[in-house]
């Protein structure tokens, strides 16, 4: 039996309004619990369009057929008009998710975090996280115990900023296994649960065809030497590719693969490490990567 942490990122208004209810229904039918990370502030994701001038981002958008994958409402959100606030407008959906799944903060403003947080000072970052946590807690009526940085934009500054909130764990980086990042003080920080597996949009049209993706991914899961964690997006697997996701769950069950919330992957003793800026194939720009203590 192979246990895989299932993380669901919700980036947009449409992903929350349309994708999350579909995913909740799918997961209920398959008796699966997951960790769902919500963006709760303005939906400004369309402002990423300026990144089309960067060849790597343009190629990603073309090979993944982004217009069909996400829809033009997502691709243009917050461009010619202010982005709609996601959280309170979809409070009932978020509360329903929290009844059955582990719910955490993805971002206040997903676009702002992904585009600008790398240049924020620590207090600006703390204020932004606090705003998101406060909003999500108002919606679900209970403390939020976990978070996942938007776009995996995380480094030592993010690690230090999140210590102020005493969360149970964060999932801010890519890596191989859960660990505790070393703080500037030399003490271990809040547990990190890295994503170990590639997302749909990182590999489609580059490493694998859409129709072959599920078999390809299951092979990666079964060969994973660490603690496998897989991320799906409400805007993808909850919308245009929900049938592919259902097929993945059926095939996974046949292979003895089970999915669980990320918190179930935590253990009392974790290795020490750091979150450093790095790059991975299929994703434009830097992102947080796990570095085990003592490695280079």
Swiss-Prot record:
Biological processes, Gene Ontology terms: 4-amino-4-deoxy-alpha-L-arabinopyranosyl undecaprenyl phosphate biosynthetic process; lipid A biosynthetic process; lipopolysaccharide biosynthetic process; response to antibiotic
InterPro entries referenced in this protein's UniProt entry, alphabetically: ArnD (IPR023557), Glyco_hydro/deAcase_b/a-brl (IPR011330), NODB_dom (IPR002509), Polysacc_deacetylase_ArnD (IPR050248)
E.C. code: 3.5.1.n3
Enzyme class, spelled out: hydrolase
Cellular-component GO terms for this entry: membrane
Record GO terms (molecular function): hydrolase activity, acting on carbon-nitrogen (but not peptide) bonds, in linear amides
Pathway: Glycolipid biosynthesis; 4-amino-4-deoxy-alpha-L-arabinose undecaprenyl phosphate biosynthesis; 4-amino-4-deoxy-alpha-L-arabinose undecaprenyl phosphate from UDP-4-deoxy-4-formamido-beta-L-arabinose and undecaprenyl phosphate: step 2/2; Bacterial outer membrane biogenesis; lipopolysaccharide biosynthesis
PROSITE patterns: NODB
Superkingdom as given in the UniProt entry: Bacteria
Reaction(s) this enzyme catalyzes, per UniProt: 4-deoxy-4-formamido-alpha-L-arabinopyranosyl di-trans,octa-cis-undecaprenyl phosphate + H2O = 4-amino-4-deoxy-alpha-L-arabinopyranosyl di-trans,octa-cis-undecaprenyl phosphate + formate
Keywords for the protein's UniProt record, in alphabetical order: Antibiotic resistance, Hydrolase, Lipid A biosynthesis, Lipid biosynthesis, Lipid metabolism, Lipopolysaccharide biosynthesis
Positions of transmembrane segments: none
Residues annotated as domain NodB homology: 2-260
Homology family: Belongs to the polysaccharide deacetylase family. ArnD deformylase subfamily.
Protein's job: Catalyzes the deformylation of 4-deoxy-4-formamido-L-arabinose-phosphoundecaprenol to 4-amino-4-deoxy-L-arabinose-phosphoundecaprenol. The modified arabinose is attached to lipid A and is required for resistance to polymyxin and cationic antimicrobial peptides.
Protein name as annotated: Probable 4-deoxy-4-formamido-L-arabinose-phosphoundecaprenol deformylase ArnD
Organism: Escherichia coli (strain 55989 / EAEC)
């Amino acid at each position: 039996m192979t246990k895989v942490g299932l993380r669901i990122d919700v980036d947009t208004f449409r992903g929350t309004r349309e994708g999350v209810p579909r995913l909740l229904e799918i997961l209920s039918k398959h008796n699966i619990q997951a960790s769902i990370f919500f963006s709760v502030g303005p939906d400004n994701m369309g402002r990423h369009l300026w990144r089309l001038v960067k060849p790597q981002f343009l190629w990603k958008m073309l090979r993944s057929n982004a217009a069909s994958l996400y829809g033009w409402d997502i691709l243009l959100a917050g461009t010619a008009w202010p982005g709609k606030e996601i959280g309170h407008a979809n409070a009932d959906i978020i509360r329903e998710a929290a009844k059955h799944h582990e719910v955490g903060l993805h971002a206040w403003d997903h676009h702002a975090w992904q585009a600008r947080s790398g240049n924020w000072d620590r207090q600006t970052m703390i204020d932004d996280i606090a705003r998101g946590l406060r909003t999500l807690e108002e919606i679900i009526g209970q403390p939020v115990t976990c978070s996942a940085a938007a776009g995996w934009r995380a480094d030592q500054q993010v690690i230090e900023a999140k210590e102020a909130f005493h969360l149970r764990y964060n999932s801010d980086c890519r890596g191989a296994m859960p660990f505790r990042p070393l703080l500037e003080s030399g003490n271990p920080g809040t547990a990190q649960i890295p994503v170990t597996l590639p997302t749909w949009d990182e590999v489609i049209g580059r490493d694998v065809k859409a129709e072959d993706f599920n078999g390809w991914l299951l092979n990666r899961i079964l060969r994973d030497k660490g603690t496998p964690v897989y991320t799906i997006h409400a805007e993808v697997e909850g919308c245009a590719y929900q049938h592919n996701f259902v097929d993945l769950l059926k095939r996974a069950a046949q292979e003895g693969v089970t999915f669980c919330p990320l918190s179930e992957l935590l253990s009392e003793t974790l290795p020490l490490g750091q979150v450093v800026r790095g790059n991975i194939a299929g994703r434009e720009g830097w992102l947080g990567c796990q570095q085990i203590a003592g490695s280079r």
